[in-house]
Curated annotation (Swiss-Prot):
Known role: Mediates resistance to pathogens which are sensitive to stilbenes.
Family annotation (InterPro entries): Chalcone/stilbene_synt_C, Chalcone/stilbene_synt_N, Chalcone/stilbene_synthase_AS, Polyketide_synthase_type-III, Thiolase-like
The reaction(s) this protein catalyses: 4-coumaroyl-CoA + 3 malonyl-CoA + 3 H(+) = trans-resveratrol + 4 CO2 + 4 CoA
Enzyme class, broadest EC rank: transferase
Biological process terms in GO annotation: biosynthetic process; defense response
Record protein name field: Stilbene synthase 5
Name of a matching Pfam family: Chal_sti_synt_N
Classification lineage: Eukaryota, Viridiplantae, Streptophyta, Embryophyta, Tracheophyta
Organism whose genome encodes this protein: Vitis vinifera
Length: 392
């Protein structure tokens, strides 16, 4: 009879969790930041608020965003005007839209990741699904498993209402699953739709207005597994370590409250300072074991909470401008898609490395860091190791 220790050892994988494929998707409806103030004040029937519109236009101009993809259309707002009001009861219709559309958008990204991976979907053993909104039972994980036709035995983890740091959370979770279950292949999906947070403007809620200028919709999927079969699987990044911490006395710095009016968004003005003053401690804890203290020697996947956060981190760590190029590119092209952002940036990083004929998936560098920032104020830190670039 095998001992508990023998059984335990047999269950463990031998090598580190590795990202084996990435897929991304967005809604079809695209809005451009240059004229978004006109669009937003029109669809929310707020054109009489001329001074607030000027202020919102300045926020949009400073956002460093070129365009975003948003599921909510003008026609939908005409049909459901309470969504476009500032504080009107509207949770029921928001929920109806979200619970249907979040799994569908997640499916689009998942199918792209599965196609790149190239293996039968029956080999997916675990599913980790993350979204900020649309809580119900059974959840979006169950719906996605059915939409994709995954095995009924797939082991599911559903993460709701984590917020912008959760792109790091899902990778940390997938790492633990892959490394503690030999042969596991974990499908990770982040699907974010801003229907729950969209609302009209108010003079008394400028933090809400900032959110309306920054957030976009998108979904991203990755497949994670240990001990890849390199004859049929192509490793992209290894997940070396993963940690989470929260900054003391900052519980309200980034907050969301779900009420009958939807999810209201609250932001302290000093969030960029809070993050930038605490990020080096996270870096040191993660990289001291590797003997790394030069932050410019890393490739960077940082959640693009907004240009002010990126600027503050860049200045505090004396980062070269090119270090956050992939992050700024995703912010410009898609806005802040909450948990999905860092996975979009991972995708951009490996594509950019291929196009630039770099030696590794991390822009030619070996080591990298992935950061998620969000409510709590919570910071997720994932240490990445790139792999040699393979061209077909």
């Amino acid at each position: 009879m095998a001992s508990v220790e023998e059984i335990r050892n047999a269950q463990r994988a031998k090598g580190p969790a590795t990202i084996l494929a990435i897929g991304t998707a967005t809604p079809d409806h695209c809005v451009y930041q240059s004229d978004y103030a006109d669009y937003y004040f029109k669809v929310t029937k707020s054109e009489h608020m001329t001074e607030l519109k000027k202020k919102f236009n300045r926020i949009c101009d400073k956002s460093m965003i070129k365009k975003r993809y948003i599921h909510l259309t003008e026609e939908m707002l005409e049909e459901h005007p309470n969504i476009g009001a500032y504080m009107a009861p509207s949770l029921n219709i928001r929920q109806e839209i979200i619970t249907a559309e979040v799994p569908k958008l997640g499916k689009e990204a998942a199918l792209k990741a599965l196609k790149e991976w190239g293996q039968p979907k029956s080999k997916i053993t675990h599913l980790v699904f993350c979204t900020t909104s649309g809580v119900e039972m059974p959840g979006a994980d169950y719906k996605l498993a059915n939409l994709l036709g995954l095995e009924t035995s797939v082991r599911r983890v559903m993460l709701y209402h984590q917020g912008c740091y959760a792109g790091g959370t899902v990778l940390r979770t997938a790492k633990d699953l892959a490394e503690n279950n030999a042969g596991a292949r974990v499908l990770v999906v982040c699907s974010e739709i801003t229907v729950v947070t969209f609302r009209g403007p108010s003079e008394d809620a400028l933090d809400s207005l900032v959110g309306q200028a920054l957030f976009g919709d998108g979904s991203a999927a990755v497949i994670v597994g240990s001990d890849p079969n390199v004859s049929i699987e192509r490793p992209l990044f290894q997940l070396v370590s993963a940690a989470q911490t929260f900054i003391p006395n900052s519980a309200g710095a980034i907050a969301g409250n779900l009420r009958e009016v939807g999810l209201t968004f609250h932001l302290w003005p000093n969030v960029p300072t809070l993050i930038s003053e605490n990020i080096e401690k996270c870096l040191s804890q993660a990289f001291d074991p590797l003997g790394i203290s030069n932050w410019n020697s890393l490739f960077w996947i940082a959640h693009p909470g907004g240009p002010a956060i990126l600027d503050a981190v860049e200045a505090k760590l004396n980062l070269e401008k090119k270090k956050l190029e992939a992050t700024r590119h995703v912010l410009s092209e898609y806005g802040n898609m909450s948990s999905a952002c860092v996975l979009f940036i991972l995708d951009e990083m490996r594509k950019k490395s291929l196009k630039g004929e770099k030696a590794t998936t991390g822009e030619g560098l070996d080591w990298g860091v992935l950061f998620g920032f969000g409510p709590g104020l919570t910071i997720e830190t994932v240490v990445l190791h790139s792999v040699p670039m393979v061209t077909n």
